[in-house]
Regions:
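C-terminal accessory domains and tails appended to enzymatic cores
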Residues: 153-158, 163-165, 179-180, 186-289
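Active-site adenylate/phosphate-handling loop in enzymes that bind or generate adenylated species
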Residues: 116-162
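Active-site rim/loop-helix segments in enzyme catalytic domains that contact anionic ligands
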Residues: 18-120, 142, 150, 160-161
Length: 289
């Protein structure tokens, strides 16, 4: 009974907060144009539909991710794809001009990340963990971690006012086990927006229908028609939630979690603000709906 009363109290407080029109600012970092889409696309759509402000930032321009072209020609295509994807997701999409495959955790890049977080006045910052097969993915995680404290330090990047409070920093889900596996704290069921997520992702034609199939040796299997391509992309992303995600989802969604087909999971990073359950519900109001 006490647990029921507590849940009702948290829901009431979160509902009151957002009924007053307060918006949440979420910024998501990825290494390449399309990374944010894969990891947080459904969550972004849900938050945007609730009126919150979401921004995707790619730390490289993606100019190496193709088998038949590269450099400036490819960068232009990938920037245009990201712009179209942003429209479909309902988010702002920024692509920084670092070369694909050459991202390094330099001071210059750290300052770029700090400025992006500050300019967005972020409440939540999402990025990959620094455990990954791709160096650009790893260093994206490192750069965001390195910015976590510095975003509130006035004398660092002083041309952009510091944040008055440290954001919540979250890791997006991955399957890597060493040095430690991903441990979800926040599960977002995206079943209701899975199809719109796939449609938005399909804006990255050079990646999902050319580059990635080529690297997998399946280029000849890519359908020629849009419907077939959407089905192919949906099948690729239709992965049943693992046990850890489902267990985490039960905490927030109750019995509804057992019916979930698609969940985006997030782990709280130790370096930023450590949110309470009530604060998590305020930042991710879809958890109480």
């Amino acid at each position: 009974m006490k647990r029921v009363i507590l849940i009702c109290y948290l829901i009431l407080n979160a509902t009151l907060l957002f009924s007053q029109g307060e918006k949440v600012n979420i910024i998501v970092f990825g290494a390449h144009p399309d990374d944010c889409d894969i990891d947080t696309g459904g969550t972004a759509i849900l938050l945007a539909k609730l009126g919150h402000n979401v921004k995707f930032v790619s730390l490289t321009n993606g100019d190496a991710g193709h088998y038949a072209m590269g450099g400036g020609e490819l960068a232009k295509i990938r920037i245009a794809e990201a712009k179209e994807a942003g429209k479909r997701f309902g988010v702002e999409y920024t692509v920084l001009d670092n070369h694909d495959g050459e991202l390094m955790p330099t001071l210059e890049n750290r300052l770029k990340v700090i400025r992006e977080i500050r300019k967005w006045n972020a409440d939540v910052v999402i990025a990959p963990r620094p455990n990954d097969y791709h160096p650009d993915h790893r260093y994206t995680g490192v750069l965001v971690q390195d910015a976590a404290y510095m975003v509130i330090v006035p004398n660092v990047a002083p041309e952009v006012p510091p944040l008055q409070k440290n954001p919540v920093f979250l890791y997006s889900e991955d399957g890597f086990q060493k040095p430690s596996p991903f441990k979800p704290d926040i599960p977002v069921i995206i079943d209701a927006v899975f199809d719109p997520k796939i449609y938005a992702m399909s804006a990255h034609k050079s990646q999902f229908f050319e580059w990635l199939p080529w690297t997998a040796g399946n280029l000849e299997k890519v359908p020629k028609d849009d419907k077939g391509r959407l089905e192919m992309l949906a099948n690729w992303r239709s992965q049943a939630p693992n046990e850890a995600l489902l267990k985490c989802a039960e905490k927030w969604y109750g019995n509804k979690a057992s019916y979930a087909k698609h969940i985006e999971g997030f782990e709280i990073c130790e370096y930023g603000k450590q949110p309470t359950d009530q604060e998590i519900m305020m930042l991710f109001p879809m958890l109480i709906r």
